[in-house]
Amino acid sequence: MKGPPTFCSLLLLSLLLSPDPTAAFLLPPSTACCTQLYRKPLSDKLLRKVIQVELQEADGDCHLQAFVLHLAQRSICIHPQNPSLSQWFEHQERKLHGTLPKLNFGMLRKMG
């Protein structure tokens, strides 16, 4: 019965000594990438359900640039040049601009 406790001890030791906890595992963490992009106009009903928006870059992990709209139950990958998404972003900017007058949206675009 020395085998399993020794393995567990070594695994625990590698977790404790590693500066990155995920580095102790043999398999890298998987990342979810958009593989298909929605290009059709987006409904107002769908856009009202958006909780968070994330930009997926076309880099080493993912090969498509997309906006990921996170809803309560799912996420949708949207083409970056979708006109209805652009209009929604402008509407959100105007809405936020009314509540946060000192926020510089031009600077946010440069950072994003």
Curated annotation (Swiss-Prot):
Protein family according to the UniProt entry: Belongs to the intercrine beta (chemokine CC) family.
Subunit structure, as described in the record: Monomer, dimer, and tetramer. Heparin avidly promotes oligomerization. Interacts with TNFAIP6 (via Link domain).
Primary location class: secreted
Endpoints of the signal sequence: 1-24
Coiled-coil features, chain-numbered ranges: none
GO CC annotation: extracellular region; extracellular space
GO molecular function: CCR3 chemokine receptor binding; chemokine activity; CXCR chemokine receptor binding
Species whose genome carries this gene: Homo sapiens (Human)
A Pfam family matched in the record: IL8
Cysteine disulfide links: 33-62, 34-77
Gene name of the encoded protein: CCL27
Functional summary from the UniProt entry: Chemotactic factor that attracts skin-associated memory T-lymphocytes. May play a role in mediating homing of lymphocytes to cutaneous sites. Binds to CCR10.
Compartments, as annotated in UniProt: Secreted
Tissue-by-tissue expression: Testis, thymus, placenta, ovary and skin.
One GO biological process term: cellular response to lipopolysaccharide
Protein name listed in UniProt: C-C motif chemokine 27
Keywords attached to this entry: Cytokine, Disulfide bond, Secreted, Signal
